[in-house]
Amino acid sequence: LDKDGKILMRMGSDMHVMPGEKRGCVGCHEVREGNSTPINSPSIAMSKAPARPTPPAWENDGILDYQKLIQPIWDKYCIECHSGPTPEGMVDMTGDRTRYFCMSYDNLIEREIVDYHNVFALGHDENTPKSLGSFVSRISEFIDTDEHSGKLLLDDEKRLIYTWIDANVPYYSTYQFTRPETRGVP
């Protein structure tokens, strides 16, 4: 992560690890062409002491829940202008429910205001640092300064938004709410 909490590089896939399970990176993070790194040549990361991540400021056990964590930021800073029948720029940032998500989420995705990894799209080749996620998301134009709205987001709020983007813009906090027939969290 950089100093603002934006991810420098990310994987094009995800993995789930249960408590007590261990996961290594051998297989993906090796030289693809040629010989592997010699065993007696430790990586930079392995030559340092383990670092314990700082728990996120938003609590919620670190679980990203759009309606619970992200929407309140839009409510605080955006809906004054971006709501109603003719929202500013025709971008509705309210939490009003849509078929699967809500107006703000749909607008951010459909208008490409946030960059995400569309798992259904083609062409997921290797990427370069700072080429995906929060680094290239247009939302930065609106939240990094107070020029857009005259309001300045708190650093923790910006970091939460960047984390949400770099986690690939999850909406539901658990799989329990990911089916159309479920109502999700009200």
Each model region followed by its residue ranges:
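Aromatic- and Gly/Pro-enriched helix-to-coil junctions and flexible linker segments
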Residues: 1-186
